[in-house]
């Protein structure tokens, strides 16, 4: 009934002319008197046209309903996958997470793609991953991160993982490319922080960027000066500010941030504060393989103090 009433409202009003008889002075039908059939004509074509219009409208309505349902279903499915992926990530299930997300590598969803970039990189970082497999995974991760950024430029996480993946690829492309990429990496880390100032990881990564260029060997600095008029540079003090800021935003969020606070204080010859942060890094619960490696490194550094 709802469809019929809506359909009728869309159709033009039907004007039915009744037979008219206008008599002249002689009592006969005037020349302009007409009958209803002459106005409407043959009713069969009209009925066919009306039926076709009704069916066309019904088809359009059905298409809209199906399309809307498909969009809702697809959105619900993506949200379900993302929730499952986040659970696996928080649980430290690196391989299960990768196996889940790799099924959707052709996805057009930016949120899903940056998570796949992260998962690919995490698999590459595993000690059991061969060097050949690692290289393939690193380049694939960059591709996923790039696509994520193209699909959702407003995503802080997409900027962050794109920068991380560019940095990883630099290990295979030589010192010149690595230094040139440093400008791009910094730009995307800064954008990630701008979009989400409460993301401790992005702040931590800016600290790593500063730490890396603060400890750059003299020969690399020399190459950088030859290749670039204004090569990237930083200081341990600047790195320290970022590491502390990350800790303020989210205390004890990452074992590596604790380790780097200790290492940065060592570079600044402050052994007391270095020991404080290294002890925290050593005692950090080991949820991942990286956490275990950091525990070992922190213990070794403490032994040398």
From Swiss-Prot:
Keywords: Cytoplasm, Cytoskeleton, Microtubule, Repeat, TPR repeat. TPR repeats lie at residues 163-199, 217-253. It is found in: Cytoplasm; Cytoplasm, Cytoskeleton, Spindle; Cytoplasm, Cytoskeleton, Spindle pole. Transmembrane segments: none annotated. SUPFAM superfamilies: TPR-like. GO terms for cellular component: mitochondrion; mitotic spindle pole; spindle microtubule. Disulfide bonds: none annotated. It comes from the Eukaryota. InterPro entries: RMD1-3_a_helical_rpt, TPR-like_helical_dom_sf. One of its GO terms (molecular function) is microtubule binding. The modification N6-succinyllysine is found at residues 160, 245. Belongs to the RMDN family. Interacts with microtubules. This is Regulator of microtubule dynamics protein 1. It comes from Mus musculus (Mouse). The gene is Rmdn1.
């Amino acid at each position: 009934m709802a469809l019929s009433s809506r359909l009728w409202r869309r159709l033009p009003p039907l004007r039915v002319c009744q037979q008219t008889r206008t008599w002249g002075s002689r009592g006969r039908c005037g020349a302009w008197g007409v009958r209803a059939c002459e106005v409407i004509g043959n009713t069969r074509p009209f009925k066919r046209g009306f039926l076709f219009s009704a069916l066309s409208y019904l088809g359009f309505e059905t298409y809209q309903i199906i399309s809307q349902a498909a969009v809702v279903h697809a959105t619900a499915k993506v949200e379900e996958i993302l929730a499952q992926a986040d659970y696996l990530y928080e649980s430290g299930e690196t391989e299960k997470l990768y196996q889940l997300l790799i099924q959707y590598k052709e996805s057009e969803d930016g949120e899903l793609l940056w998570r796949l970039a992260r998962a690919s990189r995490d698999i590459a970082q595993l000690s059991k991953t061969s060097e050949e497999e690692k290289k393939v995974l690193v380049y694939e991760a960059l591709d996923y991160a790039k696509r994520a950024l193209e699909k959702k430029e407003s995503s802080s996480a997409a900027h962050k993982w794109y920068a991380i993946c560019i940095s990883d690829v630099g290990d295979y492309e030589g010192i010149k490319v690595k230094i040139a990429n440093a400008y791009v990496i910094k730009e995307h880390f800064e954008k990630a922080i701008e979009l989400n100032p409460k993301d401790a990881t992005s702040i931590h990564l800016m600290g790593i960027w500063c730490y890396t260029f603060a400890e750059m060997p003299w020969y690399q600095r020399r190459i950088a000066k030859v290749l670039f008029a204004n090569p990237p540079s930083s200081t341990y003090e600047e790195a320290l500010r970022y590491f502390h800021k990350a800790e303020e935003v989210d205390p004890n969020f990452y074992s590596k941030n604790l380790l780097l606070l200790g290492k940065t204080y060592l570079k600044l010859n402050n052994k007391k504060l270095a020991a404080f942060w290294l002890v925290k890094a050593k005692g950090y619960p080991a949820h991942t393989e990286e956490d275990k490696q950091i525990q070992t490194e922190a213990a070794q550094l403490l032994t040398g103090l």
